């Protein structure tokens, strides 16, 4: 009876949370604002069972304004659902680059992996063919320097503050079974994604492994060319071959890429995958991906330091941004020195196709909307100052309780500890109620055995974190262990997430 009373109480407190979930899913910004003004703690609500928060729903649907509202209301930006996915992962899965950009600006962790396949946000973006999301995810690793394209091509280890080994480790991080972002992009035939990954240092020689947790229908020891051969995209195969992919590579099944193509009835690939015949000369243009976007690191750093959403009043002696005509100019483009607001510079850096065909333009630069000269980086203007953000805890309403175990006020100290247990009941006047005066009904609602984080959207265990330490990844000792006995845990990226390949192919 004690447990049933707890469950009933938590369900009774969920009506407002479900309204916020509906508003986040449907993109109702006014409803979401009204609910959060009434109770800011609703941002930490998570649905029963799947544990999706309003942040997950708004990110999956691409409602970037609601995402900003929820993050500013104090929700954990790296909150996971039952599959271990964060809001950043779901935004990358559906290709909502605006949401990805906002989450990156607020400091979302790009290295977290899910519980089923060990894939990161980078894997999901590559799987579904979203190169713009990939470029935003890697904005902290690609410098805004004129010679960046040559550094990436020559694969120099450390030049001008750029450490290619760190970028190489991030972009070639493997999920369960050794699956890299290049594997899943090549499998699904996303040529633009494959080109961007190769330009940023993705390895064509990295192979999958047999780790006992995945079922690989192609075979362990497969390269990205094996996966491209299974997918059947001619351009992907040609691009991988031009970057040095080996036609004679053999996986654990003894299959070459040509044999994989035959087993999946991709007969049109045999001519270019046959290692014994003379390969035709491939005349692929030696130009960077149109999504390279060199200015991205510089403007993201400025936005994180000085803000990007402030609509400051313009002084009479200062001209507005020439693009939006609403905000004051805060940054200037290196070279042409044209001034923009931070918001417009962010939009320009993420949506413009980079220049690559003009000989006098730096590869990877974006064209200036005023003079069409290439922009490699942005610098903040002298009057642009760092912003001081208001602490989200100070905005939390203490007068409105949410998902508490009694009808009284939740102690503010409990909000900072996800493993708290209920303290003695606090009266509405703020004084503690004597033990003798407490009713048995309130005593029966003690939640020491019922984690309040299930209502508040927090985690009741320490979640695994992948951190970049000294150029390598280390996982905390309290990491999540995937059970090899679970059916879902054994589904590989190939069998669980591939949308273009059926499982009815015959073996060689």
Swiss-Prot record:
Induction: By auxin. A zinc finger (RING-type) spans 321-372. Pathway: Protein modification; protein ubiquitination. ANK repeats lie at residues 50-79, 83-112, 117-147, 177-206, 220-249. GO terms for biological process: lateral root formation; negative regulation of ethylene biosynthetic process; protein autoubiquitination; protein ubiquitination; response to auxin; ubiquitin-dependent protein catabolic process. One of its GO terms (molecular function) is ubiquitin-protein transferase activity. It catalyses: S-ubiquitinyl-[E2 ubiquitin-conjugating enzyme]-L-cysteine + [acceptor protein]-L-lysine = [E2 ubiquitin-conjugating enzyme]-L-cysteine + N(6)-ubiquitinyl-[acceptor protein]-L-lysine. It holds the Pfam family RING_XB3-XBAT31. Its EC number is 2.3.2.27. SMART domains: ANK, RING. Keywords: ANK repeat, Developmental protein, Metal-binding, Repeat, Transferase, Ubl conjugation pathway, Zinc, Zinc-finger. Interacts with ACS4 and ACS7. E3 ubiquitin-protein ligase that mediates ubiquitination of ACC synthases (ACS). Negatively regulates ethylene biosynthesis probably via ubiquitin-dependent degradation of ACS4 and ACS7 enzymes. Regulates lateral root formation and development by controlling ethylene production which inhibits lateral root formation at high concentration. This is E3 ubiquitin-protein ligase XBAT32. It comes from Arabidopsis thaliana.
């Amino acid at each position: 009876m004690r447990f049933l009373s707890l469950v009933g109480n938590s369900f009774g407190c969920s009506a407002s949370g479900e309204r916020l979930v509906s508003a986040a899913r449907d993109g109702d910004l006014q409803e979401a604002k009204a609910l959060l003004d009434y109770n800011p703690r609703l941002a930490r609500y998570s649905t029963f069972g799947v544990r999706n928060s309003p942040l997950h729903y708004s990110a999956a649907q691409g409602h970037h304004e609601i995402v900003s509202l929820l993050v500013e209301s104090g929700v954990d930006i790296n909150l996971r659902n039952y599959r271990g996915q964060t809001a950043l992962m779901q935004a990358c899965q559906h290709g909502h680059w605006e949401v990805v950009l906002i989450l990156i600006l607020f400091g979302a962790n790009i290295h977290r992996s899910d519980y089923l396949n060990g894939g990161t946000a980078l894997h999901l973006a590559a799987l579904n063919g979203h190169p713009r999301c990939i470029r935003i995810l890697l904005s902290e690793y690609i410098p805004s320097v004129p010679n960046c394209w040559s550094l990436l091509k020559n694969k120099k280890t450390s030049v001008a503050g750029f450490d290619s080994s760190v970028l190489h480790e991030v972009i070639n991080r493997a999920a369960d079974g050794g699956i890299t972002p290049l594997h899943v992009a090549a499998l699904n035939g996303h040529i633009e994604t494959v080109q961007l990954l190769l330009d940023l240092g993705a390895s064509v020689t990295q192979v999958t492994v047999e780790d006992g947790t995945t079922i690989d229908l192609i075979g362990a020891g497969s390269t990205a060319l094996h996966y491209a051969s299974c997918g059947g995209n001619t351009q992907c195969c040609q691009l991988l071959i031009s970057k040095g992919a080996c036609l004679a590579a053999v996986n654990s099944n003894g299959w070459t890429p040509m044999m994989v193509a035959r087993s999946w009835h991709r007969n049109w690939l045999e001519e270019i995958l046959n290692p014994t015949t003379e390969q035709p000369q491939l005349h692929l243009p030696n130009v960077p991906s149109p999504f390279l976007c060199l200015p991205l690191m510089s403007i993201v750093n400025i936005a994180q330091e000085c803000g990007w959403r402030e609509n400051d009043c313009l002084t009479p002696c200062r001209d507005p941004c020439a693009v939006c005509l609403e905000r004051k100019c805060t940054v200037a483009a290196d070279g042409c020195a044209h001034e923009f607001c931070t918001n417009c510079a962010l939009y320009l850096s993420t949506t413009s196709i980079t220049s690559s065909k003009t000989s006098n333009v730096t590869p990877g630069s974006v064209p200036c909307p005023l003079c069409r000269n290439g922009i490699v980086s942005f610098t903040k203007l002298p009057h642009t100052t760092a912003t001081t953000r208001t602490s989200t805890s100070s905005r939390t309403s203490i007068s409105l309780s949410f998902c508490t175990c009694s009808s009284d006020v939740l102690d503010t100290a409990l909000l900072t500890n996800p493993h708290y247990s209920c303290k003695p009941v606090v009266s509405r006047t703020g004084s503690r109620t004597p033990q003798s005066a407490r009713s048995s009904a309130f005593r029966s609602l003690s939640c020491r055995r019922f984690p309040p984080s299930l209502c508040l959207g927090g985690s009741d265990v320490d979640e695994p974190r992948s951190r970049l330490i000294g150029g390598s990844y280390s996982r905390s000792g309290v990491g999540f262990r995937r059970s090899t006995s679970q059916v879902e845990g054994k589904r590989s990226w190939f069998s669980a997430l591939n949308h273009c390949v059926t499982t009815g192919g015959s073996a060689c």
